[in-house]
């Protein structure tokens, strides 16, 4: 069963469900993101997708690349680009940690979940991850199935 958030104001906007399947996530980090007004209004309607996006450190800044935020219908004249690079807010110490992590072979920055925090600000949880091979994916799937089967047996017998 999914864990309930500690704060009732915590609202998930978009979730990258493939991230945990395709990548072995070593650690995660909460970052802010710079958005335009029409993007925030579109996110409040839940119209976004981060499944195909990734993060990159470029020229001393952290960027979210290839994320989709649907256009806000009421802001047609002053709307926003649907897929554009969006700057993320992170401290210098965390930025250097992320840059060092991505310099290791096979490591990448993957967005895990986008949400509104208790103050109503859009936050993004990104993970430092390493891509899984097909065999690793099968092992993860087998472990998950075995844990479900164990839970079923314990529920029936206990």
Swiss-Prot record:
Residues 149-158 have a biased composition (Basic residues). One of its GO terms (cellular component) is cytosol. It comes from the Bacteria. GO terms for biological process: trans-translation. It is found in: Cytoplasm. InterPro entries: SmpB, SsrA-bd_prot. Residues 133-148 have a biased composition (Basic and acidic residues). One of its GO terms (molecular function) is RNA binding. Keywords: Cytoplasm, RNA-binding. Residues 133-158 are annotated as: Disordered. Required for rescue of stalled ribosomes mediated by trans-translation. Binds to transfer-messenger RNA (tmRNA), required for stable association of tmRNA with ribosomes. tmRNA and SmpB together mimic tRNA shape, replacing the anticodon stem-loop with SmpB. tmRNA is encoded by the ssrA gene; the 2 termini fold to resemble tRNA(Ala) and it encodes a 'tag peptide', a short internal open reading frame. During trans-translation Ala-aminoacylated tmRNA acts like a tRNA, entering the A-site of stalled ribosomes, displacing the stalled mRNA. HAMAP family: SmpB (MF_00023). Belongs to the SmpB family. This is SsrA-binding protein. It comes from Jannaschia sp. (strain CCS1). The gene is smpB.
